Amino acid sequence: MEAALLVCQYTIQSLIHLTGEDPGFFNVEIPEFPFYPTCNVCTADVNVTINFDVGGKKHQLDLDFGQLTPHTKAVYQPRGAFGGSENATNLFLLELLGAGELALTMRSKKLPINVTTGEEQQVSLESVDVYFQDVFGTMWCHHAEMQNPVYLIPETVPYIKWDNCNSTNITAVVRAQGLDVTLPLSLPTSAQDSNFSVKTQMLGNEIDIECIMEDGEISQVLPGDNKFNITCSGYESHVPSGGILTSTSPVVTPIPGTGYAYSLRLTPRPVSRFLGNNSILYVFYSGNGPKASGGDYCIQSNIVFSDEIPASQDMPTNTTDITYVGDNATYSVPMVTSEDANSPNVTVTAFWAWPNNTETDFKCKWTLTSGTPSGCENISGAFASNRTFDITVSGLGTAPKTLIITRTATNATTTTHKVIFSKAPESTTTSPTSNTTGFAAPNTTTGLPSSTHVPTNLTAPASTGPTVSTADVTSPTPAGTTSGASPVTPSPSPRDNGTESKAPDMTSPTPAVTTPTPNATSPTSAVTTPTPNATSPTLGKTSPTSAVTTPTPNATSPTSAVTTPTPNATGPTVGETSPQANTTNHTLGGTSSTPVVTSQPKNATSAVTTGQHNITSSSTSSMSLRPSSISETTSHMPLLTSAHPTGGENITQVTPASTSTHHVSTSSPAPRPGTTSQASGPGNSSTSTKPGEVNVTKGTPPKNATSPQAPSGQKTAVPTVTSTGGKANSTTGGKHTTGHGARTSTEPTTDYGGDSTTPRTRYNATTYLPPSTSSELRPRWTFTSPPVTTAQATVPVPPTSQPRFSNLSMLVLQWASLAVLTLLLLLVMADCAFRRNLSTSHTYTTPPYDDAETYV
């Protein structure tokens, strides 16, 4: 034994005292073994040596329990027994109790070693040594000495069963050697008039555990909880056993035929698993003082053992957060409580949290005489003159990393430190990003250059050309956006899929572009970005078409609005090289909490003269640029959202170059779907931009995703109706989506056939919002001129239909029809007058009502 203990680096010693009668097993609790925190692969190899005295001769039994995995298994049996009898492995159990504590259990009425005849009565248990080698290779030992020799008396235990004991349907459950059960019972007297005593007995599989009240009885039962301690035969656990008696009946109301109701909770320990699941708990109790027979009443309950993993085995841990600048960080590990300047045996270990390789991740171990071991990467350490241990880490990167550090002194006192190293952000070189709603897809702001930090709320001079303007507002951040991005001035030379986008011809039909400085008090101050070929739907595979308008919101106007397009936002791929652009429209009124109206992006890769960029709105209305090559993102839409299920859209909104006070009135009727009025309004298939008009041109979907019946490769352009109330509605593939796809329409898809490069009107199944008079702002579109007040056409007529007759012929037909109708009316009136004069008196012989009447 002494030789074996020499290999132990740390040893814990204890004295075992067995009390009462032998219950049929010995139980030794072994505390303070190191199970490291935040480590699922931290195992331990455990071996146990049992030291016997047989007639003055020493005998040793070695048990190999193998590897302990505290996160997956709680009960272990020896894999082998050296120096024992044939069935020795069946006589021992090792159980995890939680908090780094083990329990070794051995049957006491069967001999685990081979002895000669006549020596059976001379076998005594002297001591137990437990060897626990952790994942760092450190050997921890526990030496448990018996206070008095404990003799093993092999005998057969008779089967015991108590009669006249009331059975219950309640099962007593044992977890980590602790039994817990609550039983209902009754006493003949009320609480303050009663005393109480109890005794328990657990029987099964040649095990007999008895537990009694330490003070014998509760002399006076009080209302509420009456707590008491109990003592069980065998090993006395360091966790006390006890019980609680609670009165559950009103003080003056007995239960007829049974008396007064009580609740009894019992928690005896240790309860060995050798009892088995067929064992029985007997409870003997009395309400009139202790009885020699054990009590006046008896109830019984079945016992089952749970395989549930007990409470965490991990050592207690102190947590420290360290934020550092640069490449290295240092943490000083102080001495443990019982350590002094002369302690000869000090060990420090360190590993990164949640390791996965026991061969390579546990190399960092230091002693007073050793340096940094080989294989300890990114971690170095050394003892200082004051016995503190300084650990330096390096090369951690930007993500926080957690280091687990332990320090152990000579008497096996151990402290554990959890240190979280976080690198301080370098605000001058990176643009921080954050997901404010939890809906934005990853890489939402990857278009930002990593080495560029752009201040927010920048406004370009009016003469600088295309500029994305921002404004501070109090609207909440819309869902699916990324905050923290900064606006920058776009580059004038964008590229899209390798196709260079030319600057717009200012002499073309595209309106002149101006960039006025935002006016904080103007109700409709806006900034218009130049739109190349803004109104001509070009659907060639390599011909970029994009239209972007970014009006500046007015923080003080109740009708201010912001339309922030999002070119180059990506979704499900629609076309290989067909340039498309989606627009994300936000209402950012100064005091409005209106949800954002978002047009779902569908893999648009449009080239714009203002630069390939993706504008994402945040709580500070900051915007950021994105390059033409970008990973896919997903736009999540809140309420009041119109989604375009397939294809990308080029949406052009023309805003005034100068200050205007004209807005769409919320009381104006919304145009019907498919309206083809040549005057103005949505549904106009003309390529000219009219007041109040929003032209939407579909891109080129692969295999004509917009029209499933069209032949492969066909290009289809479908204008989409947009209401003046601010909702963009689209019917694509026969489905109309509003919000999160809550509404659908069974409108069939029209197959135009042929080369449908000319935009045609599709009749949409559209539901518009009613006019709102509430103070909550709704999204609105701005016009280049006052809104048209003439009546809109209410009958959908295809724009290409031609009249069959001339206007003069139609006029003649109308007058002729009117004359014929008038003549017929006169003839009818004359006939009625003639018949009235010829009428005579009549009497109904069969009255149509209950009483007979004469009608003239």
From Swiss-Prot:
Coiled coil: none annotated. Keywords: Glycoprotein, Host membrane, Host-virus interaction, Late protein, Membrane, Transmembrane, Transmembrane helix, Virion. Primary surface antigen capable of inducing and reacting with virus-neutralizing antibodies. Almost all EBV candidate vaccines are based on gp350 proteins. InterPro entries: GP350_C_dom_herpes, GP350_C_dom_herpes_sf, GP350_N_A_dom_herpes, GP350_N_A_dom_herpes_sf, GP350_N_B_dom_herpes. Residues 442-488, 575-616, 674-690, 703-730, 743-776 have a biased composition (Polar residues). It is a single-pass membrane protein. Residues 421-779 are annotated as: Disordered. GO terms for cellular component: host cell membrane; membrane; virion membrane. Residues 831-856 are intravirion. It is found in: Virion membrane; Host membrane. Residues 427-437, 507-570, 617-631, 654-669, 731-741 have a biased composition (Low complexity). Gene3D superfamilies: 2.60.40.2800, 2.60.40.2810, 2.60.40.2820. Extensively glycosylated. Pfam families: Herpes_gp350_A, Herpes_gp350_B, Herpes_gp350_C, HV_Gp350_C-term. The chain crosses the membrane at residues 810-830. Interacts with host CR2. Initiates virion attachment to host B-lymphocyte cell, leading to virus entry. Acts by binding to host CR2 at the surface of B-lymphocytes, facilitating the binding of viral glycoprotein gp42 to HLA class II molecules. Attachment triggers virion-host membrane fusion and invasion of the host cell. Belongs to the Epstein-Barr GP350 family. This is Envelope glycoprotein GP350. It comes from Epstein-Barr virus (strain GD1) (HHV-4).
